[in-house]
């Protein structure tokens, strides 16, 4: 079974024995070498190119690139640019989370929700794109932002995002998805080991110094995770089924992001460190890190003696979560997933809630057939 998202795929091969996942192999088949197209260009070209190359979270990619370029020059965003960047990051995070939940959920929505969900998603997309386009043009104003944020909030509410907490509103698409997993006890609960700003120094140093780190990142003695579940304080609650906790974390993340976006429009003041940060790196370099829908995204650059980009590195959130020895594999391994289509259904739910940025393919086989 294949779920389409974007370029490349993640292969998930699971061997089951007596209905338990006894072996899990995850292999990414993604286009490599994309960062080579940045090398040799002027640093100021990187943000625009990053936003064009990546179809998902393009604004987050652009902001991470911009932060890295500024950090390499020992510069920072001014207040106006920071306002636009924060607004755009929040808007994109809200829409991308909603889009992935509604469109990628493996169980079809009940007919009474499906048509309305599509309409509300289109409204959310239009509001998000309005905020992002104003940010790109440097024309973010608080009144304009407030109007777009209200429109985005209305669409999210219609899809089930609550005003408080993480329980979806009744008779909505998100409530239907929660019903699909609220009694699913296939996967045991696990507390996430969040990737945070405190890890940036080590991550960026390894990204710069270790070949292949961008595709197989690691932190010694840890199984680091990034994204809504890792960001959520409620992720440690043990009583709810694991899939329901992951879903609630994403619903809660959208609610929090909407609250932050509304406050930003009202006051113009926001602690950007919770969304994005940057710093210099050796060799006339810099990095930018942003918290996007799927987790923490890194861009790291080096500028050569000719003033052009001499090196460019990107580390995406999916590489942490779907690492061959990462949190997705740890959660899946030894779980009673069943066999055949039942196993595919359970694994696909888990994969969607880990939210990869590319398609995934699931293959399940019995140990006797391996």
UniProtKB/Swiss-Prot annotation:
SUPFAM superfamilies: HydB/Nqo4-like (SSF56762). InterPro entries: Ni-dep_hyd_lsu, NiFe-Hase_large, NiFe/NiFeSe_hydrgnase_LSU. GO terms for molecular function: nickel cation binding. It holds the Pfam family NiFeSe_Hases. Gene3D superfamilies: Cytochrome-c3 Hydrogenase, chain B. It comes from the Bacteria. Belongs to the HupK family. This is Hydrogenase expression/formation protein HupK. It comes from Rhizobium leguminosarum bv. viciae. The lineage of its organism: Bacteria, Pseudomonadati, Pseudomonadota, Alphaproteobacteria, Hyphomicrobiales.
């Amino acid at each position: 079974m294949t779920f389409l998202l974007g370029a490349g795929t993640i292969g998930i091969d699971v061997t089951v024995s007596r209905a338990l996942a006894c072996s899990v192999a995850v292999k990414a088949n993604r286009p490599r070498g994309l960062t080579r197209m940045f090398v040799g260009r002027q640093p100021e070209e990187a943000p625009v190119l990053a936003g064009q190359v990546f179809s998902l979270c393009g604004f987050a990619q652009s902001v991470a690139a911009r932060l890295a370029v500024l950090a390499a020059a020992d510069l920072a965003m001014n207040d106006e640019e920071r306002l636009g960047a924060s607004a755009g990051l929040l808007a994109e995070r809200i829409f991308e989370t909603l889009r992935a939940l509604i469109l990628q959920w493996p169980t079809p929505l009940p007919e009474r929700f499906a048509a309305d969900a599509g309409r509300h998603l289109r409204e959310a997309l239009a509001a998000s794109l309005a905020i992002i386009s104003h940010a790109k043009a440097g024309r973010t104003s608080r009144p304009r932002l407030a109007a777009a944020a209200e429109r985005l909030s209305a669409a999210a509410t219609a899809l089930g995002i609550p005003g408080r907490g993480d329980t979806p509103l009744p008779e909505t698409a998100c409530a239907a998805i929660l019903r699909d997993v609220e009694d699913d006890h296939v996967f045991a609960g696990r507390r996430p080991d969040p990737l945070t700003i405190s890890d940036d120094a080590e991550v960026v140093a390894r990204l710069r110094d270790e070949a292949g780190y961008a595709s197989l990142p690691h932190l010694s003695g840890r199984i680091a995770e990034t994204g809504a579940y890792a960001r959520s304080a409620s992720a440690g609650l043990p009583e709810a089924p694991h899939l329901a906790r992951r879903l609630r974390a994403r619903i809660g993340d959208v609610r929090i992001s909407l609250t932050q976006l509304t406050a930003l429009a009202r006051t113009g003041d926001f602690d950007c460190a919770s969304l994005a940060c940057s710093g210099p790196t050796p060799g006339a370099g810099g990095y930018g890190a942003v918290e996007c829908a799927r987790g923490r995204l890194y861009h790291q650059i080096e500028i050569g003696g000719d003033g052009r980009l001499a090196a460019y590195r990107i580390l995406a959130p999916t590489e942490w979560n779907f690492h061959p020895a990462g949190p997705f594999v740890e959660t899946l391994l030894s779980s009673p997933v069943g066999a055949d289509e039942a196993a595919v259904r359970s694994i696909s739910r888990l994969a969607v809630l880990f939210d990869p940025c590319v398609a995934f393919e699931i293959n399940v086989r019995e140990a006797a057939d391996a």
